[in-house]
Amino acid sequence: MSANNNMESEIKEIESISFGMMSSEDIRQMSSFEVKTAKISSTNLLETVHDPKSGPIGSAPCETCHQNEWDCPGHFGHIELNVPIIHPLFINHVVNILKIFCWKCNEFLLTKDHLELNNILKLEKEKKFNAVLEKIKKCDRCVHCTTPRADYKLVLNDITYKTIYRTFSYQGGAVKTARDKKLNESREIVSAEMVKKIFDNIKLEYVEMLGISHPKDFCLEVFPVIPSCCRPHEVQDGNINDDDLTYQLMEIVKNNSMIGAIKLEKESMEKQYPECLKVKEILLLSNVEKQKKEIDDFLKKPIKNGLKTKKKINKEEITPLDQYLKLHDKYVKYVNNLKFRIETYCNNSQGKATHATTGRAIKGLRERLTGKEGQIRNNLLGKRCEMSARTVIGPDPTLKIDEVIVPKEIAQSLTFPDFVNKHNIDRLTKLVNSGNAIRLVKKNESGQEIKINLAAAINNHGTPLQHDDIIKRPKITNNHEEKHNYEEKHNFDTFETIVIKDPKNFVLKEGDILFRNNFQQKVVLPSKKFIKLEEGWIVHRYLQNGDILVLNRQPTLHKASMMALRVKIMDVKTFKFNLACTKPYNADFDGDEMNAHAPQSEESKAELFTLSTPKQCIMSCQSGKPNLTIVQDSLTGAYLMSKENNNDATLTNGEFNDILMVLTQNDEYNGDVVDYFLKRKEDVSNTLKKLGFSGTVLNGKGLLSLLFPNDLYINEEDLKINRGVIYDGCLTKKYLSSTESSLIKILYKEYGVETCATFLNNIQFLTNRWLMISSFSIHAGDCIKQKEVLGTVEQCLMESEKIKMTTQNPFIREQKIMQTLSNAKDVGMKIAKDALKRDNVNLHAQNNFLTTVESGSKGDHLNIAQITSLLGQQITEGQRVKPLLSNGKRTLPHYILKEENNDTEHFHDLLEEYESQGFISSSFAQGLNPKEFFFHCMAGRQGVCDTAMSTATSGYIMRRNVKLTEDIKVAYDGTVQDTRGRRFQMAYGELGYDPSKLVKVNGKPEVCNIARLVNKLNCNFEDNIK
């Protein structure tokens, strides 16, 4: 007990985390074992990568902490490297640090005074270091020893490892001495030993002044070995395979051991042949060209002690000098291999390291931690759950906003635990015995839970049949039910003989006699057992109509990305829901998939029904505008219906009642639905007569008026409603979408959630049914190009030519030309818009392109201009397309190379000149030629790239924000605090208002619009007096 108490008392709260490099001593102190050999035997695993001190192997306890595999956290080991290695992840930092220190005296190239004069020391850590790097570039020599400054570059050699090269150069190219000239022409390799020597001599005061940690730890002398639990072996086809990291560690140990053995052999030769020391000095030269030259000179000189005499070494006739050089080549090879293995152990994102047998790329530490499939996002931040499903989504205009169609396959996979009580015991008993439940849970006398598989408990499959069993069945005339299950059938007295070829699908019947190997067998017919439930048992039943299901589309950015919908089971393959719910999900039906989650308790169902149904998500909690809106077909239908004249009867009485019938299936009205609409129809007719109309309701406006409350008043320029009756204006996106003046918001705020939800359902049912009578489509006649456009293009091009001749400054000239050419698109848009409206008036026909734009259901006037007029100037990187071919004289090879001063006399030549820089005079209806298509793709490509980049950036920011604020909540006292009780706000948003319940009055958020409520009361009072 005392040990446990001591352990508990030592546990403290983490205050901060710091990241940095571990020194060699830190790694040794942390290590529980040293890996010395790559050879593994079944009897001895000590000092290998599978050392028992790294953690338990199988059922054996850990030899370090003596815990089992569940409790042991794992223990690090280490490898003593026989040669220092620059840490591959920090090699760029190493190069930058080398640049600011002298390569000869290892002092800082500048003085502290230099930094103080330029106010560099006052900067933050990273900014300070970058400023020092920029300052060093202007320095030629070390201020301490006057040695020329060296420049360092990182070069990738043989696509496997990186090498640091050192060169000497001077600002302005001035060479001062013979030594300087010699250095200036050299290019040296900087080895890890040289880097370590420089870093070891760097004074601590310089490190503190620069605000960095000491760089000596960037040179690895000891390599850590992660615990075995972090690199578990995997079993495939009965074979045990080592993890990728274990494979890499074994390769590191192999190469390290070979380096150690070669070093010992070289030292032995240096003792035996002292002249080898001279060769060693030459081989250590960092200048490759100088090294080759001195080796050649050394080989030409006469050498004593038999260094050039051939001897039998390792069964090979070779001179000791050649053997020594051969050992050096092997040494360099294994050092490079060691660098490569350590680099790919840390980061193998480019797939350089592969398995020798399979060729599969090895997963390094970086790949395991970072990215979508890494440990952090996939495991630590990942959300995994049972009772969920995923499939493609689609629309269904017959559904209400709070309903979802679920495929039958999914409904028979997801379950809900129902507790048996006196109120539901009969219903659940029927479900269990009809095969609509999967599992039964009850408790025995000792209180232990017993799980019963209902399929096995209810169904008795009878005698198991085998292939070639013989069944004798009483002969039944004209019964071919089992004909497909047997191949041989012979009449035998009053029986028919059946040879079973498909035992799984054959069903025994009463009177069957079974023979197996000429012996009669006992026949037990298939039967079902009746299960009687008791109170307190738990029935895991399949989903049923009316159940709650949470539907989610990723990315989940706000509350309404997960909404609770009521289930309707159908024999389909996709989820289907109402189109009004597409906006909060940001969903479309071009192949999008969504997730469904089945709640597993009555409490969670109640919480979802109270907080997360579409009715509770109608208004956005961020902007206060409607989340659920009328879109596309329904919006077009509402616009066309409200555009009809109040005095015209465009529908027969039968058609009117037929359309009205779709509303009577709605059970959300109080009282008799039919009586409600008959009374409402009479009220609408009376209101129209008072307003000076004929009083007919047999048109679109009359139908729509039935949906509004009888005390709704709207008095806008483009829409007027009196006592819930539309008598002027049209319903457009402004009034049925996500705007401040939306009717959805007004109904939600003034009449409540239920009235608003009923309106959203009914207006979609009504408009969709009306469109079945009054069809709507777009045809080729709506896309005719206007003749006036050609004159506009010519006028804009001529203006551009005038600007080109009169403006001298090239920058100003280009900006004016761009503005003039962009005007062509605006003028084309105006021409298209006016022409379409003019055609509507003259021909008394509706251009359906214009209808979709004016209603707001799809597109805008710019889209119409692009289809019927011209696309205009294409912009890439904020300017016209640059001529990059033929020394900057043309943009594409399709255009003829012309002289710079060549004047264009004809319009065709002028058009081609501007077309070559991205001006498109064609429309989509006319079609783009190949050259125009190139330019159009150039402009579109930039938008695609920007979208992809911004999506990744915003997603990363969102993940960080969610993680940082995941425990912040509004407490019961109204304050905003986290789980530790730290308060961030005394009231949410400083005011404590819910944005979804506010309205904007003159641009300011208010609890309610007093002027509107007063006007409503006055209108009601005046109508009652009349």
Curated annotation (Swiss-Prot):
EC number: 2.7.7.6
Record: residues binding Zn(2+) 1: C62, C65, C72, H75
Entry keyword set: DNA-directed RNA polymerase, Magnesium, Metal-binding, Nucleotidyltransferase, Transcription, Transferase, Zinc
Binding site for Zn(2+) 2: C102, C105, C142
Major enzyme class: transferase
MF (Gene Ontology): DNA binding; DNA-directed RNA polymerase activity; metal ion binding
Residues making up the signal peptide according to the UniProt record: none
Listed SMART domains: RPOLA_N
Chain residues that bind Mg(2+): D588, D590, D592
InterPro entries, A to Z: DNA-dir_RpoC_beta_prime (IPR045867), RNA_pol_asu (IPR000722), RNA_pol_N (IPR006592), RNA_pol_Rpb1_1 (IPR007080), RNA_pol_Rpb1_3 (IPR007066), RNA_pol_Rpb1_3_sf (IPR042102), RNA_pol_Rpb1_4 (IPR007083), RNA_pol_Rpb1_5 (IPR007081)
Catalysed reactions, as listed in the record: RNA(n) + a ribonucleoside 5'-triphosphate = RNA(n+1) + diphosphate
SUPFAM superfamilies with a match to the protein in the record: beta and beta-prime subunits of DNA dependent RNA-polymerase
GO annotation, cellular component aspect: DNA-directed RNA polymerase complex
GO biological process, any: DNA-templated transcription
Protein's job: Component of the DNA-dependent RNA polymerase that catalyzes the transcription of DNA into RNA using the four ribonucleoside triphosphates as substrates. Largest and catalytic component of RNA polymerase II which synthesizes mRNA precursors and many functional non-coding RNAs. Forms the polymerase active center together with the second largest subunit.
Similarity comment: family membership: Belongs to the RNA polymerase beta' chain family.
Identification of the protein by name: Probable DNA-directed RNA polymerase II subunit RPB1 homolog
Organism: Invertebrate iridescent virus 6
